[in-house]
Amino acid sequence: MATHKKHYHTLALALGLLTTGGLLSTQALADQLADIKAAGVVKVATFDANPPFGSIDAKTHDIVGYDVDFAKALAKKLGVKLELVATNPANRIPLLQSGKADLIVADITITPERAQVIDFSTPYFVTGQQFLVPAKSADKLDDYSKARIGAVKGTTGEQALHQRFPQSRVLSYDDIPLALTALRNGNVQAITQDSTILAGLLAQAPDKADFKILPDLLSKEEIGVGVKKGEIALLNVVNDELVNLEKTGNAAKIYDVWFGPQTASPQPRAFKIEAQ
């Protein structure tokens, strides 16, 4: 009898561990899409100091921009409220991985290195890195191969500088306005960022006549929505909505609001959002 009791106790313990393990496995594989819908809100990491992608509106004090309009469209598709989480380039992925953000919609370039730690949607924007320099400076990119160049921490531009110009001195800043201040003060001889961000930055600068954007590209880059690794259901919804925005013409309308001919940083739209 004692042997039987011991056997039953061992079996019950094993079943308990199995059940607990099953619960833990289920929790580990929790569907973030379902969690977002249950919470009724999607938290989106976006910029608040990088116009025209994301910046503070001086009148409303709301974050507005190209990325914000896409975030609004995604929240509408999910059927939940939108909560914007202000970020800078270096904090984008940590916010996502820590659960403080559900999505990254913050001008984040798709790279193999980043794709190892987060998943990316199909690109919803295509851009390139350029240089902003004093108006009387050299016009060729290679003329800055040994210069002091400002970049934003955690960006592909920062990485591209080290690869393209290993003899340059790269100084990193938390955001692009700080980099521009360094350029004004003569601490750096050039700064680099996405072409569209530089155009928006220069358009708003009171001393814009003192600077110019060099025509050559440091790199060509595709921008996607960042999703936590393995959240396939959420990623599929994001991709479906991005493609739908293109098909309905709404993606082009959003682009025109921020980059159209009437804007401070006009640029022709040379891409389409396509399923991959």
Please describe what each predicted stretch is:
Residues 23-30:
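Sec/Tat signal peptide C-region and signal peptidase I cleavage site
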Residues 160-173, 242-276:
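Ligand-binding clefts/hinges and TM-proximal coupling segments of bilobed small-molecule sensing domains
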Residues 54-58, 71-80, 157-174, 202-206:
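Ligand-binding cleft/hinge of the Venus flytrap
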Residues 31-107:
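Extracytoplasmic small-molecule ligand-binding "clamshell" domains
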Residues 48, 125-132, 195, 199-242, ...:
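Periplasmic-binding protein-like
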Residues 76-77, 85-86, 90-103, 117-119, ...:
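Short helices/loops that flank or line small-molecule/ion binding pockets
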Residues 68, 83-94, 136, 153, ...:
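Short helix-initiation/N-cap motifs at beta->coil->alpha
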Residues 133-149:
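Flexible hinge/capping segments at coil-to-helix
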